[in-house]
C-alpha cells in the first residue's frame, strides 16, 4: 500500500460496533480485563494491550501504528509535545558524566534543554558546526551518547549531511538523533540516510491548524536499551504520553497532510521568488533556492522538497518590527507549518531570553524575520508583504 493511501486507510483500525469510518476517541483511563492472568500479562508486557492510558491508549496507538507503517520504524511513541519527544529521547540516551554532540544552531528551547537542564544532571553538550565533519569527529569522544541535530535549523536554515554524520556516529556505536519536524516523515526516509531515532513536533504539520499539541519519537530499532528506557521510564515514570483527543485530531491531519504539504511547498516557492525582487529586502534565505549553499544537499536528502519555512533580512531590528506591525493578513504567531502564513522576529521572541552574546554565537540576527507559509492565495500574501514594507 502506498503512503498516500496508507495515511487514510490502514489495516490497524479494529472493528467498531457502529461501523465508524474514523478511529473513535477512547476517552478512558483504565481498562477491564477478562481475568487476572490477562491483566498480569498486559501489565508485565507479555501481551501488548492497553492497561492504563498513561502508557497506552487505543486511539493513540492507532496513530503510532499508522506512523510506524509509513516510516518503516520498529516502534513509534506518541508524546505530549514536540519538546516532550526531544527531552524524552535525549533523557533515554544520556547518563551522568556523559555528553551529547550537537549544533550551535537549533531551536531555543532545545538549546536550553541541552545547555541548562541536562547539565544539572551531570550531562554536558559539545556544540559545534555540524557542517564541518572534522569538528564533529573531534567533538565525539568515549563519553558521547549521541549526535543530535535539526535537519533544517530554526531559524538559521542550515542543513547538515545526515549520511556523513551517521557514519561518524556509527563508528562510535552511538545513534544519530534527528529532529525532522521541518520536512514531513511522509516526504523522505530519514532512516535510509542513517538516522537511528527521529523526533517530530506533530504540533506543526500533523496539526496543521494550530489546534493540538503533540510529538512523536520514531525508533528504528538499532538501540534496544533506548526503546526500553523510553517506554519504561519516560511513559511510566514521567507521564509524557499523548492524549487520545490529540491523537484523534492529529490522525485527521495526517490523512490530508500530503495535499496540504504539496500546496504549501508550491506557495513557498511562489512567495520566495516574488519577494526576491523587492529592494527593501536585503536577502531571502530558503534552502529551495538553487543559489542557496545547502540547495544540492537538501534536494538529495529530502526528495527535492525544501519545506515551508524561509527567512528575510531587513536593514535593522526597527525595520523588522515596523514590517511585522503593518502586516494585515500574515499572522504574528510563533507556530510553524500552519495552514496560515505566519511571521515572527526570532531574536526577540523564541530567542528573547538569550543574551546578545548567545544569540550572536547561534547566528540569530536582529535583522531576520522568519516566515512559515500557509495555504492562502499567495497573491494576497505578496500584496500584504508589499504594503507592510
Residue spans of the language-model regions?
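Conserved small-domain helix->loop->beta segment predominantly found in fold-type I
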Residues: 269-328, 332-340, 354-360
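Short, solvent-exposed beta-strand edge segments and adjacent coil->beta transition regions
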Residues: 47, 212, 247, 305-309, ...
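Glycine-rich beta-alpha junction loops
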Residues: 12-14, 27-33, 204, 256, ...
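Short conserved active-site loop signatures built around small residues
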Residues: 1-26, 217
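Short, well-ordered beta-strand elements within core beta-sheets of diverse protein domains
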Residues: 249-259, 307-315, 370-374
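PLP-dependent enzyme catalytic core of the Aspartate aminotransferase-like
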Residues: 115, 124, 138, 318, ...
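Conserved PLP-enzyme active-site core in the AAT-like
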Residues: 7-13, 75-280, 285
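Conserved N-terminal alpha-helix of the aminotransferase class I/II PLP-enzyme fold
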Residues: 30, 35-84, 109-116
